Amino acid sequence: MDLSINEGTLVVTGGPGDTPQNAIVIKKTPRGLSAAGAETMLLGKWFGERGRTWTLKRQEMVQLEGRTYDTYDVVLGDGSEKRLYFDVTDWLNLMAPARC
């Protein structure tokens, strides 16, 4: 999924994010938008307004099998809970300064 935003394109690939193996992959964000900012924007697009139709229970960064994931535990308006995995490995590598 590519979403055009003012200063570039948000590039997201992968699966539904229900497991690390099917993680939502943040490949690229527009200038000035962090991976976490992109993730929050996507959560709002999928679930609606934060604090109204969903709330964030917990967010953490985890390392699994050499990949880096942002995990979000959200509580939806009906009381159900959902955990989403965002793979930010490629984004972090893009943002890392070049090594000499």
Q: Over which residues does each language-model region extend?
A:
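N-terminal trafficking/processing presequences and adjacent post-cleavage segments
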Residues: 1-42
